[in-house]
Amino acid sequence: MAFPAPAFSLANLLNGSYGVDTPEEVERVRSEQRDEAAAACRNYRPLPAVDVSESVPEDAHSLRTPDGAPSEEVSVEFVTYGAEDYLEKSDDELLVAFETMVKPMRIGQLWCPAFNKCSFISSIAMARALLLAPRTSHRTMKCFEDLVAAIYTKSDFYYDDECEADDVQIDISSRDVPGYSFEPWSRTSGFEPPPICEACDMIMYQCPCFDFNALKKSCAERTFADDYVIEGLDGVVNNATLSSNLGPFLVPVKCPYEKCPTPVGEIPPDLNRATDRVDINLVQSICDSTLPTHSNYDDSFHQVFVESADYSIDLDHVRLRQSDLIAKIPDSGHMIPVLNTGSGHKRVGTTKEVLTAIKKRNADVPELGDSVNLSRLSKAVAERFFISYINGNSLASSNFVNVVSNFHDYMEKWKSSGLSYDDLPDLHAENLQFYDHMIKSDVKPVVSDTLNIDRPVPATITYHKKGITSQFSPLFTALFERFQRCLRERIILPVGKISSLEMAGFDVKNKHCFEIDLSKFDKSQGEFPFKIQEHILNGLGCPAPITKWWCDFHRFSYIRDRRAGVGMPISFQRRTGDAFTYFGNTIVTMAEFAWCYDTDQFEKLLFSGDDSLGFSVLPPVGDPSKFTTLFNMEAKVMEPAVPYICSKFLLSDEFGNTFSVPDPLREVQRLGTKKIPCSDNDEFLFAHFMSFVDRLKFLDRMTQSCIDQLSLFFELKYRKSGEEAALMLGAFKKYTANFQSYKELYYSDRRQCELINSFSCVELRIERSSSTKQREKKDGIERRRNDKRRTPTGSYGGGEEAETKVSQAESTGTRSQKSQREGAFKSQAVPLPTILSSRWFGTDRDVPPCEHGGIVRV
């Protein structure tokens, strides 16, 4: 029974009766829609002729088409819900319907095509109208869901499986649909579907195998260990003393590592070029203009001034013992440089000199840090160290077996110095808190223009004896090699056989450089860096008993200089000459850097002792004040920063490879060094020449682009002319060409003195060889048996040989004076042809030996 629609009134409007369809009204509307749909299906094609007398029964719910008409079922879904019904649905229900009909592709949180409520409802309304409209094409129209998707994505409304290639598409834009125009359109947005994972048939962006966040945590960065393979294991002889000192974990095997050959894609051409004419005056003028205060520097009598002048110093807990000082052993002299570059003479470790060095290098420890919780914060810094630098998988899989082999290599190295296995002490019976102390005789050249007001102070060395160092050094060497193999690829420690400053495929140009200068690094290290390195050593795999043992006798130590008679106690500061100096300084610098700066913002990080250098695309962000307030370090950020580390500039060639170039200013200063000992055959000078050539092997790679880079970096660092740096390269090219050119830089006055004194101390004897006893002793003058300065022997009369003998004259007594007078007389009486063979003058006759006898004084 149908109820009449409610009348319009204020009461019906307020109670919600008016405007709401009753169930009977809804059923009536849907019945009319089904009737219209059935009529549309009947009108799809003309009905065949039938007898009028025959009645065709029809059912409103089950429609049967006549024979020959297409049998299609009327979709109830699109009839049941019209556009007005979708307007009443919620957004979640519309999203479900959109995903069911349009079937969008999900990429992360995005849908393609994107959902638009108005467009989706309009597509539904248009699809409903198209299905109800008379069909004018013989092509099969898509079903309701596909038709909605086609209208939403503006694609074809018909299926393509029944379409022939030669058929002419009908312009459906001519359909009589008011307000709409339809035309076939293919997607031309350039969208490409994402790749599908073969393992789980999911989009790779959604596949857990390709989750980038998971990959970042699970897959570690490439390390140095990926470039090195194990060649094999070699057995070595174990040593009982070493095993008893360092523990039973030592394995008597050797595990060598070799670097995998790097594929070379491009071979740089030969870049050797001729240079301009360089002379010694040009090099000296470069030194005078670049180092104005160095050209007049002369410290020949510096030691005399130190010992004779008044001296005052303020030190605490210093012990002086002046009773048994070791006297200085005089040396044989040194080569004198032609260039004056401000280099100093060797320093002698006297009491005053040692006290001055201790005052600067060991005493007056700065107190700049704040009070912190050492235990908690040291563990946090060590944890940050491993997260920033270490590949945990490589650390877990690396070995630690080369201790014994390194020990034997160390013993072979110092075997010539008298170190043997029998001399190894028992470390448990030694007091390891006592260190020997000395100063470096060679003073590091100064590049600042302060030599007119200041004199450089020599550095100090605090060390154990070789017998003690030989047992700890192999352990830390093996641990350092393991540490290097586990570093991430962008972390470089330029030391050892598996790392260097040569970086292939990395260009330093167009990068932000970052350099931290840490002053007073050794003596500023307190208990906090000490605890940090203890946690890091345990994390790297060093046996805990050895780590604790090593750290215990470094908490409080006593240094003593036996030559100067000076001793004083020290605490946590770094020992400059023990087995852990470089390794310890490097890990402390890396830990402090990782705590103050985020290492992920750098493309490359280089560390070496207290030196650090970073390269980044964007300006680095961090807090350098923590170096001072937290770690008690005097830190200075270098501005402007240049690629400079370990006294070397880093340059990039045209092939995108980076190589190191020694600082030209320091190399020029080394050309004027005063520490080369004198020798008869120039062996020490030749050793310095070979070292000079090895350091300057980069000259063959210096193109004009590299020279321009070096000039620019030189100007930025020293505020000096970059053109002079290019002139220095020309001088280096000349003096590395051959040894004769390098010898022009040095001379020795000792040879001149020997030449003058040789007239009174050397005698030339030419005599007939008679018997062995006569050759050994004649006229009371002993002949030097092992003298190698002999002239070639010649043949005299009778086929006998004559030889030239050089012997030392008697220094004292009347006989020496008499022999000198006789020699002077005979040297005037005997002519030169009597000394030389007559064959030298073109005569072949034999001269009697008696005419050539006697002694000739030169």
UniProtKB/Swiss-Prot annotation:
EC number annotated for this UniProt entry: 2.7.7.48
Superkingdom as given in the UniProt entry: Viruses
Region described as Disordered: spans on this chain: 772-830
PROSITE patterns: RDRP_SSRNA_POS
Domain RdRp catalytic stretches: 511-624
Gene Ontology process terms (BP): DNA-templated transcription; positive stranded viral RNA replication
Ranges of compositional bias, category Basic and acidic residues: 772-785
Catalytic activity: RNA(n) + a ribonucleoside 5'-triphosphate = RNA(n+1) + diphosphate
Top-level EC class as recorded in UniProt: transferase
Polar residues bias: start-end ranges: 805-817
Pfam families linked: RdRP_2 (PF00978)
Signal peptide as annotated in the record: none
Keywords from the named record: Nucleotide-binding, Nucleotidyltransferase, RNA-directed RNA polymerase, Transferase, Viral RNA replication
Gene Ontology MF terms: nucleotide binding; RNA binding; RNA-directed RNA polymerase activity
Database matches in InterPro entries: Bromoviridae_RdRp (IPR047309), DNA/RNA_pol_sf (IPR043502), RNA-dep_RNA_pol_alsuvir (IPR001788), RNA-dir_pol_PSvirus (IPR007094)
Oligomeric form and interacting partners: Interacts with replication protein 1a.
Family stated for the protein in its record: Belongs to the ssRNA positive-strand viruses RNA-directed RNA polymerase family.
Record's function text: RNA-dependent RNA polymerase which replicates the viral genome composed of 3 RNA segments, RNA1, RNA2 and RNA3.
Name of this chain's protein: RNA-directed RNA polymerase 2a
Protein's organism: Cucumber mosaic virus (strain As)
